[in-house]
Swiss-Prot record:
Record's subunit section: NDH-1 is composed of 14 different subunits. Subunits NuoB, C, D, E, F, and G constitute the peripheral sector of the complex.
Annotated GO CC locations: plasma membrane
The encoding gene: nuoD
Similarity-based family: Belongs to the complex I 49 kDa subunit family.
GO molecular-function term, one example from the UniProt record: NADH:ubiquinone reductase (non-electrogenic) activity
Topology of the protein relative to the lipid bilayer: Peripheral membrane protein
Protein name: NADH-quinone oxidoreductase subunit D
Catalytic activity: a quinone + NADH + 5 H(+)(in) = a quinol + NAD(+) + 4 H(+)(out)
This enzyme's EC code(s): 7.1.1.-
Subcellular location as annotated: Cell inner membrane
């Protein structure tokens, strides 16, 4: 049967005008049908006089030229819609450029068209791996702007839930980090602990993921006896899980070699690049908002700030494990010190009334209607900035009021956006295979970075 001639690759007839792959217009072999013959000729030359075959002889080897590679935005290892364009010499990265904004939704502008309470669910969708931390950061900023006092029990509840959110975020980071390095089973192990935390969130807030449990002036629901029991059971067993992960990874040769000395950032570079959170402390800077600018009840509990001096991916791994241990300490102290009392402000202009008041009293129904319609009204011209120590770093909200129930301006200090600014520096001189490990060690969430 006669063979039909296949058409040339689109653009072959354009010659030098075809620039889809710069410097790759050379024909390594004449046609696809000659591929096997070319490989055999190359093997024969390697066993003979060492000279390359005639079809391969060229002054420039295409494989030794500089190459431009797109990593993302549709790539599972970029932890979201992150695009990184790298210039390589062989497999070594000479330069990289980040291209972000693929998940931009205009959250700051949306906030200006919502009441302060209506914007709460939008914060869940920023860092969607630790939504409770976003809720608390927003509430604290509004409460500072409007000078709202939060009951003590509500502050303890917020602390406990925020630390559970931190553990949940770090568990996902560790599982994904192991999978990025080739250990797929580790992803499943860390999700067992996340599932326990989701069950606690469901019991407390009625939702597993985007909880929206914190409220301006307090929290939506109090802890039930079952919720407290579930939290105590979790903090009793979780340290053993951490010890199991340490036994699995701390001396694992593959894990250590994939992370040690990779993506290194010195203390001076970390400060210049604006790193925050675990990435900053992993480079030797002991800064934690919970200690230096305490909020809620963090100044009443005892905990240490983990710090590592190496500044590489392995240091960031050790630091996040230590952070989870400290979160367990904080939760245990919160449970012991939490007293009975109200969970929301009793001022009808500052917080929603309870459901019992809404259902069984005319005043409660009116207050609920007015707060939903108007919301919190800070003084005109007031402005404030409040930050918390989220799982990714310093998460802050800057608010400006025009005297209405909606903010005049909202500015979000997102740690994922801040940390990504250091990535171009971290990738320089690294192997392209280490790109996914470096991205994972920064732990970015693109919903928060792009806003």
């Amino acid at each position: 049967m006669p063979q039909t001639q296949k058409p040339d690759f689109p653009g072959n007839d354009l010659g030098d005008q075809f620039r889809f792959w710069p410097k790759h217009n050379e024909k390594i072999y004449e046609r696809l049908e000659n591929k096997h013959a070319w490989l055999e000729e190359k093997r024969a030359a390697a066993q003979g006089d060492g000279k390359p075959p005639a079809t391969q002889r060229s002054e420039v080897d295409p494989l030794e030229n500089e190459m431009i590679l797109n990593i993302g935005p549709q790539h599972p290892a970029t932890h979201g819609v992150l695009r990184c364009v790298v210039k390589m010499d062989g497999e070594t990265i000479e330069k990289s450029v980040l291209d972000i904004g693929y998940l931009h939704r205009g959250i700051e502008k949306l906030a200006e068209h919502k009441t302060y309470q209506e914007f709460m669910p939008y914060t869940d969708r920023m860092d969607y791996l630790s939504p409770y931390s976003n809720n608390v950061a927003w509430c604290l900023a509004v409460e500072k702007l409007a000078d709202i006092e939060v009951p003590e029990r509500a502050q303890w509840i917020r602390m406990i839930m925020s630390e559970l959110a931190r553990i949940s975020s770090h568990c996902l980071w560790l599982g994904v980090g192991m999978m990025d390095a080739g250990a797929v089973s580790g992803f499943v192990w860390t999700f067992q602990e996340r599932e326990e935390i989701y069950s606690i969130m469901d019991e407390v807030a009625g939702a597993r993921f985007t909880v929206s449990h914190s409220r301006i002036g307090g929290v939506a629901n109090d802890f039930s006896p079952r919720a407290i029991e579930m939290i105590r059971d979790f903090v009793d067993t979780f340290p053993d899980r951490i010890a199991g992960w340490e036994g699995l990874l701390n001396k694992n040769r593959i894990w250590v070699e994939r992370n040690k000395g990779v993506g290194r950032v010195t203390k001076e570079e970390a400060l210049e690049l604006g790193l925050t959170g675990p990435n900053l402390r992993g480079s030797g800077v002991p800064y934690d908002v919970r200690r230096f600018e305490p909020y809620l009840k963090y100044d009443e509990v005892d905990f240490t700030i983990p710090v590592r001096e190496e500044g590489d991916c392995l240091a960031r791994y050790f630091l996040r494990l230590d952070e989870m241990k400290q979160s367990v300490r904080i939760i245990e102290q919160c449970l012991d010190r939490m007293t009975e009392g109200p969970i929301r402000s009793d001022d009808a202009k500052e917080a929603y009334p309870s459901k019992e008041e809404v259902y069984y009293s005319m005043e409660g129904m009116i207050h609920d209607f007015m707060y939903t319609d108007v919301g919190t009204v800070p003084p005109k011209g007031a402005h404030s900035y409040h930050a918390i120590e989220g799982p990714k770093g310093e998460l802050g909200f800057y608010l400006t009021s025009d005297g209405t129930g909606r903010p005049w301006r909202v500015r979000i200090n997102a740690p994922s956006f801040t940390n990504l600014q250091a990535m171009e520096h971290m990738l320089e001189g690294e192997m392209v295979a280490d790109t996914v490990v470096i991205i994972g060690s920064l732990d970015p969430v693109m919903g928060e970075a792009d806003k």
